[in-house]
Amino acid sequence: MASSSWAFFKVFNPQIAPKSISHIGQSDLMQLTHKKQLPTFQRRGIAEDSLLPSSTTPIKPMHVETKHTRTMGDIFVQHSQKLELFRNVLRNAAELDALEGLNMIDAVQRLGIDYHFQREIDEILHKQMGIVSACDDLYEVALRFRLLRQHGYFVPEDVFNNFKDSKGTFKQVLGEDIKGLMSLYEASQLGTEGEDTLVEAEKFSGHLLKTSLSHLDRHRARIVGNTLRNPHRKSLASFMARNFFVTSQATNSWLNLLKEVAKTDFNMVRSVHQKEIVQISKWWKELGLVKELKFARDQPLKWYTWSMAGLTDPKLSEERVELTKPISFVYLIDDIFDVYGTLDDLILFTEAVNRWEITAIDHLPDYMKICFKALYDMTNEFSCKVYQKHGWNPLRSLKISWASLCNAFLVEAKWFASGQLPKSEEYLKNGIVSSGVNVGLVHMFFLLGQNITRKSVELLNETPAMISSSAAILRLWDDLGSAKDENQDGNDGSYVRCYLEEHEGCSIEEAREKTINMISDEWKKLNRELLSPNPFPATFTSASLNLARMIPLMYSYDGNQSLPSLKEYMKLMLYETVSM
């Protein structure tokens, strides 16, 4: 059995014990909890979050479904054999046909199972660097460009100059090549600041693809529409994989084999996630905060989805469980600042977090004492685990992250207590910190335990651009959701509202367009950071990217202020079994 499969086997076994969780149907995922009564100066859509499952919405355990009754050992042996078979097929195909190798890598990544084939992908893409511009096929050039950039190779944008006319614009004849246009559109999502050719490529391909929708057959129109809505760079592979299953047509044997591998993988991973939810629910229930702080959100399943989306390797089970704990406290403290705390009490709470001394809680109200004590204990326990496992005490960095978060929350509380909105730039600068992204990624870095050095920790403490760009994307996406109703209270504090206040005569549509463009700019900055040398391990940078990809699912509200995409993601990852 291959080493990666054996490690997976150890994570997957044993199965979730049915008696450890209540048995309910998957429809219970959609049950709604009651909305909380909020003050009129609500900052971000807290009430809307209550539309997601709470800790009282347990998961029903499911098992891998097969056509014949087989032991788990048999399933793993067969899975390992198919993995090894596909590795050989991938190596051989890439040697014989460079484009076929790229197609196979693309399929593996779209199915979200590339962690099984990292060595093979590394070797193939390294060889592909020598032929980046030795082709006149738009599909192949764009695919190679995208896969190489995704893998950290900086391929220049001028590889697309061959597809421009004498005026320097993309040739109109390319409009007949739908497959090539989709590949070009996908490649354009890897652009960085100042890359005008890729900006033009996105506009050119996007316009022609939208135009083509009216005359394509239903199947092809679905594929094109999905490309426009969910380009691979900005989408979670785990969420889009099922769509790839439906739309990809097996024209060769390797795709059928790969789908078989992916189906088994999906079911195994789902069982791992269910096991983790049991652990998180147990921790959250024993913590008891939901009983003591009745105003706060009770949604450990939602909080866990951040960990599940960010750390996709099944072997990182312990890390996902531990990461959910600080994420839970980000939401909890956010509720204290947004929903319940008076300004005077919030000042005292922030001072206590900055001092990080248990005696600092003496003058706090009881509910704040409970929260601070729980945060203090969780952080110290977290630090001990990291030190025991990786030999580095992260407590100083963790304290800095929590203090920065509370300081940013307090700045916002003072703004809204005064009834005055800040300038949009000032709001966003503070909002990047109050997003909580830095807290989550700092904890994640130490959990992973890779390349922890004085240099990397110092950079982490200063909030590197990789983190701030992801945080800006979250803040702006969140604010787009809270600004959907132009008749809402003007003190909600979204970037859109700050921008409207600052620019007299600007319409809400113009302000939203400005926000959308800023999100695009932050993606370009994030792309640049992921291509630039940095001291962070690949697992961490990949998780940072996945966090940015997760954001639209977390903040895309519908007309009922519900989150249909997030609910669908939870259902796919935690409930639905892929038929074997």
Curated annotation (Swiss-Prot):
<keyword id="KW-0464">Manganese</keyword>
<feature type="binding site">
    <location>
        <position position="482"/>
    </location>
    <ligand>
        <name>Mg(2+) 3</name>
    </ligand>
</feature>
<dbReference type="InterPro" id="IPR044814">
    <property type="entry name" value="Terpene_cyclase_plant_C1"/>
</dbReference>
<feature type="transit peptide" description="Chloroplast">
    <location>
        <begin position="1"/>
        <end position="31"/>
    </location>
</feature>
<comment type="pathway">
    <text>Secondary metabolite biosynthesis; terpenoid biosynthesis.</text>
</comment>
<keyword id="KW-0479">Metal-binding</keyword>
<dbReference type="InterPro" id="IPR005630">
    <property type="entry name" value="Terpene_synthase_metal-bd"/>
</dbReference>
<dbReference type="GO" id="GO:0016102">
    <property type="term" value="P:diterpenoid biosynthetic process"/>
</dbReference>
<dbReference type="InterPro" id="IPR001906">
    <property type="entry name" value="Terpene_synth_N"/>
</dbReference>
<dbReference type="InterPro" id="IPR036965">
    <property type="entry name" value="Terpene_synth_N_sf"/>
</dbReference>
<feature type="binding site">
    <location>
        <position position="338"/>
    </location>
    <ligand>
        <name>Mg(2+) 2</name>
    </ligand>
</feature>
<feature type="short sequence motif" description="DDXXD motif">
    <location>
        <begin position="334"/>
        <end position="338"/>
    </location>
</feature>
<dbReference type="GO" id="GO:0009507">
    <property type="term" value="C:chloroplast"/>
</dbReference>
<keyword id="KW-0150">Chloroplast</keyword>
<feature type="binding site">
    <location>
        <position position="486"/>
    </location>
    <ligand>
        <name>Mg(2+) 3</name>
    </ligand>
</feature>
<dbReference type="InterPro" id="IPR034741">
    <property type="entry name" value="Terpene_cyclase-like_1_C"/>
</dbReference>
<dbReference type="GO" id="GO:0000287">
    <property type="term" value="F:magnesium ion binding"/>
</dbReference>
<feature type="binding site">
    <location>
        <position position="478"/>
    </location>
    <ligand>
        <name>Mg(2+) 3</name>
    </ligand>
</feature>
<feature type="binding site">
    <location>
        <position position="334"/>
    </location>
    <ligand>
        <name>Mg(2+) 2</name>
    </ligand>
</feature>
<dbReference type="InterPro" id="IPR008949">
    <property type="entry name" value="Isoprenoid_synthase_dom_sf"/>
</dbReference>
<comment type="similarity">
    <text>Belongs to the terpene synthase family. Tpsg subfamily.</text>
</comment>
<dbReference type="InterPro" id="IPR008930">
    <property type="entry name" value="Terpenoid_cyclase/PrenylTrfase"/>
</dbReference>
<dbReference type="Pfam" id="PF03936">
    <property type="entry name" value="Terpene_synth_C"/>
</dbReference>
<keyword id="KW-0456">Lyase</keyword>
<comment type="function">
    <text>Involved in monoterpene (C10) and sesquiterpene (C15) biosynthesis. Converts geranyl diphosphate (GPP) into S-linalool and farnesyl diphosphate (FPP) into (3S)-E-nerolidol. Probably not expressed in wild strawberry species.</text>
</comment>
<dbReference type="InterPro" id="IPR050148">
    <property type="entry name" value="Terpene_synthase-like"/>
</dbReference>
<protein>
    <recommendedName>
        <fullName>(3S,6E)-nerolidol synthase 1, chloroplastic</fullName>
        <ecNumber>4.2.3.48</ecNumber>
    </recommendedName>
</protein>
<keyword id="KW-0809">Transit peptide</keyword>
<keyword id="KW-0934">Plastid</keyword>
<feature type="binding site">
    <location>
        <position position="338"/>
    </location>
    <ligand>
        <name>Mg(2+) 1</name>
    </ligand>
</feature>
<dbReference type="Pfam" id="PF01397">
    <property type="entry name" value="Terpene_synth"/>
</dbReference>
<feature type="binding site">
    <location>
        <position position="334"/>
    </location>
    <ligand>
        <name>Mg(2+) 1</name>
    </ligand>
</feature>
<keyword id="KW-0460">Magnesium</keyword>
<dbReference type="GO" id="GO:0010333">
    <property type="term" value="F:terpene synthase activity"/>
</dbReference>
